[in-house]
């Protein structure tokens, strides 16, 4: 998604494309390292607690990677950039950016993608919980 956002920046001839490409390379490196470290071991089964831990850590990891363009291009502090990314991936909609309309098209696209991915993640997480806890649909909403 970060690489796709750099294409948006390229189309609009904006100067934030390098921030997205750098972030994409960092994400690729982290993903490769986690894939190598988490290769399936024989005889190991994932427990319910492991599943919840993975979901929670994934949200934190997505936010840590998602904050990179804000740090690299807008020179935001890490705390502000993490807040902005976590807000997007949890779909809370809160922002600390005073002029969202003044952002580049690439950053606006990235913010939109974070909210979309976050919304999709919450739906998938909810659907995954229903069978585990044998909930009825009326108990979810």
Regions found by a protein language model. Give the residues of each.
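Membrane-proximal intracellular helices of multi-pass ion channels
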Residues: 1-141
């Amino acid at each position: 998604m970060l690489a796709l956002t750099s294409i948006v920046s390229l189309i609009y001839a904006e100067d934030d494309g390098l921030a997205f490409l750098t972030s994409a390379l960092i994400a690729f490196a982290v993903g490769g390292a986690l894939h190598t470290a988490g290769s399936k071991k024989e005889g190991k089964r994932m427990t319910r607690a492991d599943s919840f831990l993975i979901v929670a850590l994934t949200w934190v990891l997505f936010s840590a990677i998602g904050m990179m363009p804000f740090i690299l291009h807008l020179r935001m502090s890490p705390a502000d950039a993490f807040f902005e990314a976590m807000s997007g991936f949890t779909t809370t909609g809160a922002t600390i950016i005073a002029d969202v309309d003044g952002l580049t098209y690439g950053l606006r696209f990235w913010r939109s993608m974070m909210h979309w991915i976050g919304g999709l993640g919450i739906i998938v997480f909810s659907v995954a919980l229903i069978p585990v806890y044998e909930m009825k649909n009326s108990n979810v909403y």
